[in-house]
Curated annotation (Swiss-Prot):
Chain's gene name: LEPROTL1
UniProt membrane topology term: Multi-pass membrane protein
Family, similarity comment: Belongs to the OB-RGRP/VPS55 family.
Subcellular location: Membrane
Biological-process GO terms, alphabetical: late endosome to vacuole transport via multivesicular body sorting pathway; negative regulation of growth hormone receptor signaling pathway
Stored PANTHER family: LEPTIN RECEPTOR OVERLAPPING TRANSCRIPT-LIKE 1, LEPTIN RECEPTOR-RELATED
Predominant location category: membrane
Statement: the UniProt record of this protein carries the keyword Transmembrane: yes
General function of this protein: Negatively regulates growth hormone (GH) receptor cell surface expression in liver. May play a role in liver resistance to GH during periods of reduced nutrient availability.
Highest taxon above the source species: Eukaryota
UniProt entry tagged with the keyword Isomerase: no
Name under which the protein is recorded: Leptin receptor overlapping transcript-like 1
InterPro entries membership: Vps55/LEPROT
Length: 131
């Protein structure tokens, strides 16, 4: 039952984060859809870690370097997702209020992605690797 509660809370967090993103785009005072480009970063952020986790064997000496490279790439993707709305706001493509809403949505979404890997990342019977 604890897994179901975690799954429901993660989906709620994802919905709240996407709501902030859509509010930053669709409110009549902002009405610019440039911030939707951060959706690509949401999709790309877990990919390096998932690939490294599949390829790495814990007994291998290179496994630590591969995992660290995956974490470095993921960090670059996350920083880019936070930087893109700021660049858009500095270039006057979006308003600063929309930038704040998108950054709030980024925080919630990336916390949800991190929570997913913390809850379902273990190698037990309730792992995300079985999906």
């Amino acid at each position: 039952m604890a897994g179901i509660k975690a799954l429901i809370s993660l989906s709620f967090g994802g919905a709240i984060g996407l709501m902030f993103l859509m509010l930053g785009c669709a409110l009549p005072i902002y009405n610019q859809y440039w911030p939707l480009f951060v959706l690509f970063f949401y999709i790309l952020s877990p990919i390096p870690y998932c690939i490294a986790r599949r390829l790495v064997d814990d007994t291998d000496a290179m496994s630590n370097a591969c995992k660290e490279l995956a974490i470095f790439l993921t960090t670059g993707i996350v920083v880019s997702a936070f930087g893109l709305p700021i660049v858009f706001a500095r270039a006057n493509l979006i308003e600063w209020g929309a930038c704040a809403l998108v950054l709030t949505g980024n925080t919630v979404i990336f916390a949800t992605i991190l929570g997913f890997f913390l809850v379902f990342g273990s190698n037990d019977d309730f792992s995300w690797q079985q999906w």
